[in-house]
Amino acid sequence: ASPVPSYYQLHVPFLIWMSDNYRETYPEHWKNAVDNKDKNISSSSSFFPTMLSLAGIETPYRDDSQSVTAPHYVLKPRVYLNDHNEPRPLDDLGMKKQDFQMLEKRNIKY
């Protein structure tokens, strides 16, 4: 982790691919993923819950509110884990003006 990240460290694409057979077997996962596709998804907090959901793995650690294949996906404020392993809000990191402009250009909420 960097003490002060740049836009390029924060903007990580989140891709999901489902086969035709999977989409036919689990149409609710496909529908929810499509419904959530334009939301401001945080890949770091959504990847693990989404993979557990897609695989049908039940565990007390699974948080479906962070799964993009769940009907009740909840947007949370974005945070960055700094070099002291502490979550910090993006607007409190001392990022450059250009980084915030790029976040806004890509419609990434913070």
Predicted regions and their residues:
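Catalytic domains that recognize anionic headgroups
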Residues: 1-110
